[in-house]
Amino acid sequence: MVKIRLARFGSKHNPHYRIVVTDARRKRDGKYIEKIGYYDPRKTTPDWLKVDVERARYWLSVGAQPTDTARRLLRQAGVFRQEAREGA
């Protein structure tokens, strides 16, 4: 199964996360299929969340399952807004 989840990078006590598409059996920080964004939980920069919305929608359309945290971040980035309007 393909998942959209967070992969940690950055230094000790200063986490940053890549939002990646990966096989569910891979390690958290292991090889991934595609990087679709990044997230800075400390919000140290104005662009603390960046997501390639088009690629995220593509991966969701082909069946990728986001984790709870990834789903929350994708929702904040506006990935689900267009889909909700199309279905209504």
From Swiss-Prot:
GO terms for cellular component: cytoplasm; small ribosomal subunit
Entry-linked InterPro entries: Ribosomal_bS16, Ribosomal_bS16_dom_sf
Gene Ontology MF: a single term: structural constituent of ribosome
GO biological process, one term: translation
Oligomeric and partner information: Part of the 30S ribosomal subunit.
Family label: Belongs to the bacterial ribosomal protein bS16 family.
Job of this protein: Binds to the lower part of the body of the 30S subunit, where it stabilizes two of its domains.
Protein name per the record: Small ribosomal subunit protein bS16
Organism in which the protein naturally occurs: Thermus thermophilus (strain ATCC 27634 / DSM 579 / HB8)
